[in-house]
Amino acid sequence: MKDIVENDEIVLDTSGTECPIPVLKARKLAKELKNGDIIKVITTDPLAKADFEHYCLQSGFDFLESYYEGKKIIIKYKFKN
């Protein structure tokens, strides 16, 4: 499930999928994570920022940032267990 590790971040590319798939993939990935891991989600879903803010709040993770890289949205959060 882990796509790649880049700059000590675990990259999850969900480009081309829409709600709820990006968060569902992140939940599946969470089973493989350890405390303190930084996850970088790459998505094209315009609703993903709000979805991940809610997911992080619900799960006790730290939502770090979101920004655009061209047409893709980058979302970063810190996993806590």
Each predicted region: which residue ranges?
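C-terminal structural segments of small proteins and small subunits
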Residues: 53-81
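Intrinsic-disorder/low-complexity, polar/charged segments enriched in Ser/Thr/Lys/Arg/Asp/Glu/Gln
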Residues: 9, 36-40, 72-74
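An N-terminal amphipathic alpha-helical segment
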Residues: 1-33
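Amphipathic, hydrophobic secondary-structure cores in small proteins
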Residues: 20, 25-62
